């Protein structure tokens, strides 16, 4: 080793030593910083720092252990990065020190000794021989070494095997003799771990033998030495009670087995395996044990030790198997690793002993325990994919092992594992083997684990079941998804299996149990068919006669067509079937494929575009499917084929026993097939099949059967009627009536519906000839006394369908004699109370009545009254509150359908009697309902009226003949029904009413003007406004409603004749007594008209009228009526404004809502708003607003007591400002109003509350008083002013953000006024002169508050004034106000604002202003002094040099003491003032000022990181300003660089980055000033501010760190003193300062 002498630096030695001492600091952040600093120095001076640290440890043996550990860790950190730079001598010292530290204490102290051990391991990478020698020295033969000597040996050899493995024999020669003497568990652990590391190192050495020094070594070179160690460890140490010892021992055993000779392994294998297995049963942490066992097994397989291992395999697998039965916790890496290690053990066994493994797994699969079977399946899945070659001859055995499970396993949990095994087996030929199709069938069955939710019956909601074993729980949806994916994966990614899938998959189309799998099966079939089709494969076509197991083409088609009617079921059932039909069309029938090729893609596109179940139209889709079926039969053009298709479909009826939706569709399709077939016997037999197979208790099946029979009846009506009558007769036992007879339950519903649908599709002439005798007569006795709802619905449906079949447009001359009798029957059905009826009965019954009304002749008036009275009672039906707004709920839809059916019934009556008399009669029925207290009844009745009026116009204009009426008789009475509803609370009611009025008036006009050539008469011009009124009447604005209703009255007066007006008025008067307050607006209109015409004459009655109207308002509940009353009051004010305002202002505060609305209605009038504002401002500014009274809390103090009139005027302004209508007028009076408000802010500041007496309702009780605070009322009005002028988001937001309004309630209210005027003046510079002129008279007001407000406003106006003449007046006003202390302070502050007027004006007034400000710069009042400083700062930024240069140095000297003042504001102001002097530093006073800059620079830099933000900002700005005077281009460039944070107002410099940069600037550009600078900064080490002490420490560190040795000499820096000072800060009380000091010391690595 070479020896290199290090030159010792006392400064660096002191630094490093101090840092080493500080590693014991109590603060963690400080310790962390010290560690980093030591690393920074050590990284650059590793030999020096490590030597000092080594010496420090050696010399200070008594330092506490924690401190020693920190030092050792620092050494290790440096060593890891600089190992190759160390001198040999230092390395030896470190080795010796590390050895000493590691072995000093005989007891094990892990934290301490482990670091020392790690040091040795790290050094060993460079000095392996020396480390090995040192360790062996401390491992004397025959004695136990220190614990960490042994641990270090293991770690050392493991980390660096190439140079160290040849030494293992020597180490083992010392280990083996003492191995048997070890008693302590911790020594057992360390020896076992070391031996394991040795074995692993040998394996690594042999693997890299090409680079090894001794190439003669083999894997078994050390087996003789390791063998006895293995025997001892295994026999003695595995029995210890210490878990860690057992685990590390068994892991070492596994490693050692890798390097034992075959003979040694053979002799020990049985004992080793038995021992490992026993541990597997005992230990909690199994990862080391399983890893060891895997190593042992790999060695056995590698060396082909079958004889020795065979008898152990069963115990091994028996022990391992339970471990693989536990589902691992994948969030726990250890659990996952253990699980994978166990699987790897089975994989190793399979590689060498596959027969035994397969036999074992076969037996385990028979176990009933779910976990056991799942574990076995996991093993099979693992080995199938990894041992394909080894298991080639075992595949039949594996298949036979899982086959029983595939066929009989009930558990979804196991099925999931089986599915995963099948997809694992698929690529390896298992499915092609005999019995492989069973696997495929299992997957299809898995896809079929599905129960469709849409089966026609509502399923009760089941509460979630508690899952006992969540890890064993698999849902059917999870299994389905797995199986779906597997079948898709097999089809699309394994082309070798195509021959297996095709055409075998067709076998799964027909069986009922595979129904839910059809989407995925057809998807696979489509994929294969298209593949074969694209290459013209020979086996594309299928001979269904030879393939006896496959379904026939007609069976496939029948199956597909039925399933097509539920296309949105799982996995896009409809699209999948259509795609498959298109792909296999040529296979099924050659004549249909062309049509399918055209039609099926369109149907697929339809389904792709209609995927939303909420908007899905089932009926439309079923029609499309039926049309496709019809076209398919037509293209096949073969009656025998059609019969075969019908037979196939009938054979499949039982497939849908549990699915009434599909069964319904099947019946309809069978009916269509029978319609297209001419074989009558076939038709008869299939009708019989339908009747015998239908579930009569299910409404869907009944309907499907009935519609199917209806389809059939289109071609075979008599056969169908004969069969129905047969069932009617043969299902009866008694002769008294059909429904009294016994028969299958529910068959009556099916028969009734069948009659109805047969009527629908039968030929009209044929049906009308049969209906009276052969249809109605047999069934009539049985439908008269129905009680149950389902039977009623079926009967109603039948009657409705029969009525539609007999409609005049079908059977024009037929008279249905039993029409009225059936209608009365329907009325009786609907009239019975629940449960014999429900809403559906009412809906269907009403619709059926509408159908019968259409039949000739017209119904009688008596029957009309019966049916209408009953149906209108349905208007009272309400939706429950829970569903009132839920338009998608069944209840809401049901009630809505009921109301619609009633409207249709009335319109049908009107259609058959399109006369004015009928229309009036129908509206007369609805009149009582239109006045109901229930809103929903009013709305429904008004909608019905509107509906009828529209229908009347439609029927009249579309009729072939002219209307019989020439006039609208009683139009006035009819209109009066609607007038109250024009102002109904309900928007829809109002809209319906107005539109009804418009259409009724149009009908009257139309009847008068209609001609045969001009049936639809163009509406009169008078009616046109009603269209816009109809749209506008929905407004909630009361005034608009009044205006619109007034317009309606004008239009009505123009449109109805004179003789109709009395009727109209008579009816309208009833509206005044309407239950709805909103409907009583007529009186208000009359009152308003009277005051408009006669108001001028009512001067004497103004107080009485105003009070009367206000009193009346108290009893008004209608908003519309209230607005009408207010309009009347405004009409009075148009004649007599001031008297009205005076009465309103006399009302007590706070104003009632009626008084407020009165002020606002007056203000809305453009002729009244201006005089109203002028009157209120005059009251506030020029009339007494308060009187002075003693303060209740201090009798010696006088405070203002406000007058109520002033408070009322203030509040009234605010109430007026709430109106958007007054915006323009308020803007016109802007400067007057803003001036009034700031004056009011002054007069109500610190004012006594205003006490308002409130009269008691009890005459004997004393009147109570409420207290109103004037300033709060003023603030409300102030804010409302800005909202009124639409400046809420600009001026108001800005004022609020400054908190200006909050200041108005404090003694500093003048500051709030200044801020408010600042914002106002910025946005409205044109108003400055107006505001000043308006406020100027109040400068000499008797009220001090007026004077303060005026001066405050004046100071701020200077900032925004551009008028030279006005500026002079403003300045003179301030100079004349330096009297009262507060006024003087405000005036002084305002004088400095002259700078806002520009350079010219500033210099014009500079002498006067500077003189005024300078006199108070030393004022004892700090506030006054600070304001003067700030004011001078502003002046100096603008004033000419000649006016300031003579006093420049004097000012600098006067303000420097303020830099360190405790007052934050003074500090900020003084720095700001100093910065403002920069403009004068380049002229005649440049040299003196340059010196002043450098004198103040240390303070500026320290305070740049002051605790107070305002001080920081002042220093930042000052540094930027002074940078141009620092006579350095580098400095100027730096401070003007935007990225450094000094340029922008919102930017902030990174302080530590700045200190680093500035220290470099200082050293380069001002080397002669560095010494002065650091000696000045060092004074801040004693600062009272912690932050400044830290700043100083950082700055000193940067300066010293950046000083080269030459510069240190040039600048005369005394580094010893400075570093001692920095080191001294390591003892500071503040952790922050200690941390900064440590950081700085870390920079001084070159001292």
Swiss-Prot record:
Keywords: Lysosome, Membrane, Repeat. It holds the Pfam family HEAT_Maestro. The keyword Cell inner membrane does not apply. GO terms for cellular component: cytoplasm; lysosome; WASH complex. GO terms for biological process: exocytosis. HEAT repeats lie at residues 9-47, 65-103, 224-262, 351-389, 597-635, 968-1006, 1131-1168, 1364-1400, 1403-1441, 1490-1528, 1612-1647. The keyword Endoplasmic reticulum does not apply. It is found in: Lysosome membrane. Belongs to the MROH1 family. Lysosome fission factor. Homooligomer. This is Maestro heat-like repeat-containing protein family member 1. It comes from Dictyostelium discoideum (Social amoeba). The lineage of its organism: Eukaryota, Amoebozoa, Evosea, Eumycetozoa, Dictyostelia.
